């Protein structure tokens, strides 16, 4: 069986950029037994932090993005990734990719081992109550097989559940798209 031809990404993007739609904005370019390669466009419309058991590789092809993470010390940290830059996110790092309008990146993820679920997490943005300490409001676990189809219903459920966005520690009700600063 012959190998598939290489993908001309600039050409693909010029013909398919309309496929990169919120809330996540991703489109699977390649999927193998071990890896998934996605094009991801902005703007996205997410307020979650994604937790996964594997590393994640970011290459920012067009424009800049901001990767919000919770670092090893349990503190919020912003990592700007500029056009042309690459970044390898360590496994088990909660992260929230903030993609701006007219931006495109490539993301490479490992296939998740069976029994190693991903999680979507939302943290309270009320700094008056919590300072810089991430305070979990909600967490949803799932066995990731296809981010393109699995994230949207989880995000939509968050958006449509105002009572579920209330912090049990301070009572603050988070906006549907509100991220901790």
UniProtKB/Swiss-Prot annotation:
<dbReference type="GO" id="GO:0046874">
    <property type="term" value="P:quinolinate metabolic process"/>
</dbReference>
<keyword id="KW-0662">Pyridine nucleotide biosynthesis</keyword>
<keyword id="KW-0223">Dioxygenase</keyword>
<dbReference type="GO" id="GO:0034354">
    <property type="term" value="P:'de novo' NAD biosynthetic process from L-tryptophan"/>
</dbReference>
<feature type="binding site">
    <location>
        <position position="95"/>
    </location>
    <ligand>
        <name>Fe cation</name>
    </ligand>
</feature>
<keyword id="KW-0560">Oxidoreductase</keyword>
<dbReference type="InterPro" id="IPR011051">
    <property type="entry name" value="RmlC_Cupin_sf"/>
</dbReference>
<keyword id="KW-0963">Cytoplasm</keyword>
<feature type="binding site">
    <location>
        <position position="56"/>
    </location>
    <ligand>
        <name>Fe cation</name>
    </ligand>
</feature>
<comment type="function">
    <text>Catalyzes the oxidative ring opening of 3-hydroxyanthranilate to 2-amino-3-carboxymuconate semialdehyde, which spontaneously cyclizes to quinolinate.</text>
</comment>
<feature type="binding site">
    <location>
        <position position="50"/>
    </location>
    <ligand>
        <name>Fe cation</name>
    </ligand>
</feature>
<keyword id="KW-0408">Iron</keyword>
<dbReference type="InterPro" id="IPR014710">
    <property type="entry name" value="RmlC-like_jellyroll"/>
</dbReference>
<feature type="binding site">
    <location>
        <position position="99"/>
    </location>
    <ligand>
        <name>substrate</name>
    </ligand>
</feature>
<keyword id="KW-0479">Metal-binding</keyword>
<feature type="binding site">
    <location>
        <position position="109"/>
    </location>
    <ligand>
        <name>substrate</name>
    </ligand>
</feature>
<protein>
    <recommendedName>
        <fullName>3-hydroxyanthranilate 3,4-dioxygenase</fullName>
        <ecNumber>1.13.11.6</ecNumber>
    </recommendedName>
</protein>
<dbReference type="GO" id="GO:0008198">
    <property type="term" value="F:ferrous iron binding"/>
</dbReference>
<dbReference type="InterPro" id="IPR010329">
    <property type="entry name" value="3hydroanth_dOase"/>
</dbReference>
<comment type="pathway">
    <text>Cofactor biosynthesis; NAD(+) biosynthesis; quinolinate from L-kynurenine: step 3/3.</text>
</comment>
<dbReference type="GO" id="GO:0000334">
    <property type="term" value="F:3-hydroxyanthranilate 3,4-dioxygenase activity"/>
</dbReference>
<dbReference type="GO" id="GO:0019805">
    <property type="term" value="P:quinolinate biosynthetic process"/>
</dbReference>
<dbReference type="GO" id="GO:0006569">
    <property type="term" value="P:L-tryptophan catabolic process"/>
</dbReference>
<feature type="binding site">
    <location>
        <position position="56"/>
    </location>
    <ligand>
        <name>substrate</name>
    </ligand>
</feature>
<dbReference type="GO" id="GO:0043420">
    <property type="term" value="P:anthranilate metabolic process"/>
</dbReference>
<dbReference type="Pfam" id="PF06052">
    <property type="entry name" value="3-HAO"/>
</dbReference>
<dbReference type="GO" id="GO:0005737">
    <property type="term" value="C:cytoplasm"/>
</dbReference>
<comment type="similarity">
    <text>Belongs to the 3-HAO family.</text>
</comment>
<feature type="binding site">
    <location>
        <position position="46"/>
    </location>
    <ligand>
        <name>O2</name>
    </ligand>
</feature>
